[in-house]
Design a protein with these regions (language model features):
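Active-site-proximal beta-strand/loop segments in catalytic clefts of secreted hydrolases
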Residues: 125-128, 150-154, 178-179, 215-220, ...
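C-terminal domain-boundary segment and adjacent tail
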Residues: 142-143, 156-157, 274-323
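Active-site beta->alpha N-cap acidic-glycine motif
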Residues: 109-185, 191-198, 202-204, 211-212, ...
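Alpha-helical scaffold elements lining the catalytic groove of polysaccharide deacetylases
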Residues: 162, 182-207, 221-264, 275-278
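Residue-level detector of anion-binding/catalytic polar loops
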Residues: 146, 173, 233, 240, ...
Length: 323
């Protein structure tokens, strides 16, 4: 992972003086993680680190400040580079919202302050997967683009095994759009939750036991009680292509390219052949215009927004993100 590092017990030996240090516990400088990292004692069940420094577990990289403590919830300067550690002590990579600011960390966790996330949009696809989803994934993969798929459980049963592992492999985000697309305002809260739970269980079969990270209510309709109980962010949109209505390739292309702006969440449906065909033009043209096509979580983080369960988001435009 790091130049000159020596891998041992899934840990990494860094600077020679690290092992000699004894470090006192300190609280993080800021509760939201925007200040200097705190230093926390390892749980009593954890063995002491024979070699403090970078360590690895199945959840990610973390840094042992001495044999029994580690960095947590904030920034740390290590060997001249800036890193950020979350509330569990794991090192950040990619885009993270920290103190209301989007911060980018490379694959080795090093903060890259010059990375610009201002030209991003999120393509989102509802009601799939379907017979055309694999072709859409071909297009996304060809151009190094990601999207977020809000899937119906009834279609996951039919097509999930073929496409969900591939979605995850190319960096797409998995969303939940209910099992059968009912109007949630016509259901009880328990019945609405059951719609999403069924779909999560189906998605998890093809995603290492993990369900969706975001949800979208069918027709955009919900009740306050269901929204408060859903346990994840609710994602709406600010560009509706009406692809389900027009079913016309050129109309889809125009609907996106004539109105797109940074921070947009674009609504489409991968169950329609015309939609997937139009994406063969839309995706490379957006990239040609300088846009990055990213997932919902990445778009939010790059705009300094930490998505919250039970909140609804329409797009990310300099603070106008949710209602």
């Amino acid at each position: 992972k790091f130049a000159g590092a020596q891998l041992a017990k899934k840990g990494i030996v860094l600077s020679n003086d690290t092992a000699a240090k004894t470090v006192s516990e300190t609280a993080p400088e800021a509760e939201d993680g925007s200040g200097n990292a705190g230093i926390k004692k390892l749980a009593e069940t954890m063995p002491p680190n024979e070699t403090p420094g970078w360590q690895y577990s199945s959840s990610g990289w973390w840094y042992a400040t001495d044999a029994t403590t580690y960095y947590v919830n904030g920034w740390a300067d290590i060997d001249g580079n800036q890193y950020h550690f979350d509330s569990n002590g794991y090192m950040a990579t990619g885009w993270k919202a920290i103190g209301g600011k989007g911060c980018y960390f490379d694959d080795q966790g090093v903060y890259q302050p010059d990375r610009n996330g201002s030209m991003m949009v999120a393509l989102t696809f509802d009601d799939g997967p379907g017979v055309y989803t694999s072709t859409l994934l071909d297009t996304l993969e060809q151009y190094g683009a990601q999207a977020t798929f809000f899937m119906l459980g009834s279609n996951v049963e039919k097509y999930g095994a073929d496409v969900i592992p591939r979605m995850a492999a190319i960096g797409c985000e998995l969303g939940n759009h209910s099992y059968a697309h009912p109007n949630m305002k016509e259901l009880s809260t328990d019945d609405g939750l059951a719609q999403f739970q069924m779909t999560d269980d189906l998605i998890a079969q093809y995603n290492n036991g993990q369900g969706a990270t975001v949800i979208r209510f069918p027709y955009g309709n919900s009740t306050d009680e269901l929204l408060a109980s859903i346990g994840r962010p609710s994602i709406m949109w600010d560009v509706d292509t009406l692809d389900w209505q027009t079913k016309n390739v050129q109309a889809n292309i125009s609907a996106v390219l004539d109105s797109v702006s940074p921070g947009d969440i674009i609504l489409m449906h991968d169950i329609h052949e015309t939609t997937v065909e139009s994406c063969a033009t839309i995706v490379p043209e957006l990239i040609n215009r300088g846009y990055e096509l990213v997932t919902i979580h990445t778009l939010a983080a790059a705009n300094g927004v930490d998505l919250a369960a039970g909140e609804t988001y329409y797009g990310f435009h300099g603070g106008t993100t949710n209602e």
